[in-house]
Amino acid sequence: MANKPSAEELKKNLSEMQFYVTQNHGTEPPFTGRLLHNKRDGVYHCLICDAPLFHSQTKYDSGCGWPSFYEPVSEESIRYIKDLSHGMQRIEIRCGNCDAHLGHVFPDGPHPTGERYCVNSASLRFTDGENGEEING
């Protein structure tokens, strides 16, 4: 795992929601994320360490209320953890570089993978492929 900023640094530099999601395994309310409707070409990075996580070409509208992707940039970019919280069986996804909470992956996505990476906007930074503009979720 990469060197992660201290909790004090993160609290100072992140919004309350970004800290809650990435550090406390929280979930932003559905349909509220800043990157949910983003359709621009580019790359979605981890908000904490800037590691690339998802290409915009793999993003799709799943209707679930959070940005959804059918595959990460690489298997190493994501860490998978069994999550039995809230009386459910799910697979939590975290940044493979810094361990920040991203969301969950479900086996109900489109081809070619059949997976839906359901990701909190608050855990992402989008970099536009054309002009390099960055948008924090």
UniProtKB/Swiss-Prot annotation:
SUPFAM superfamilies: Mss4-like. Binds 1 zinc ion per subunit. The zinc ion is important for the structural integrity of the protein. GO terms for molecular function: peptide-methionine (R)-S-oxide reductase activity; zinc ion binding. It is an enzyme of class 1 (oxidoreductase). GO terms for biological process: protein repair; response to oxidative stress. It catalyses: L-methionyl-[protein] + [thioredoxin]-disulfide + H2O = L-methionyl-(R)-S-oxide-[protein] + [thioredoxin]-dithiol. GO terms for cellular component: cytoplasm. The active site is at C118 (nucleophile). Residues 7-129 form the MsrB domain. Its EC number is 1.8.4.12. Zn(2+) binds at C46, C49, C95, C98. Its cofactor is Zn(2+). Keywords: Metal-binding, Oxidoreductase, Zinc. InterPro entries: Met_Sox_Rdtase_MsrB, Met_Sox_Rdtase_MsrB_dom, Mss4-like_sf. Belongs to the MsrB Met sulfoxide reductase family. PANTHER family: METHIONINE SULFOXIDE REDUCTASE, METHIONINE-R-SULFOXIDE REDUCTASE B1. HAMAP family: MsrB. This is Peptide methionine sulfoxide reductase MsrB. It comes from Escherichia coli O81 (strain ED1a). The gene is msrB.
